[in-house]
């Protein structure tokens, strides 16, 4: 089942989560997310974007950092580590402490979904 980004963002927030889009300019993975689409997602309530990731070039990191600062959204980093067998190393990219604090501040501490 596919969701519109606005629906996904709403569901994340309803569940007490923080909505972060992962590696939006990672061109090595194929399609990227256009900047105007990111702006539309921010209008729908997107909380932040993953900036620091092995598939983002230095120029892309700079572009995304500028973009996020201008829009005052959270900037995260991630190793995207899902286990052995990939180049990704655990904790190779992380989220800056001030951004981590902003992320935690937006998260709802109570469990919203109890299945």
Q: What are these language model-derived features?
A:
Residues 1-2:
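Short, small-residue-biased leader/transition segments that mark boundaries at the very start
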């Amino acid at each position: 089942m596919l969701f519109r980004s606005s629906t996904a963002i709403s569901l994340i927030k309803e569940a007490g989560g923080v909505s972060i889009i992962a590696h939006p300019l990672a061109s090595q993975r194929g399609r990227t997310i256009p900047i105007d689409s990111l702006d539309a997602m921010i209008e729908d309530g997107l909380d932040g974007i993953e900036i620091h990731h092995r598939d983002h070039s230095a120029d892309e990191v700079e572009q995304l950092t500028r973009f996020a600062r201008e829009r005052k959204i959270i900037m995260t980093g991630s190793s995207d580590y899902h286990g052995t067998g990939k180049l990704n190393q655990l904790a190779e990219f992380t989220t800056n402490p001030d951004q981590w604090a902003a992320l935690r501040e937006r998260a709802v501490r109570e469990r919203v979904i109890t299945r």
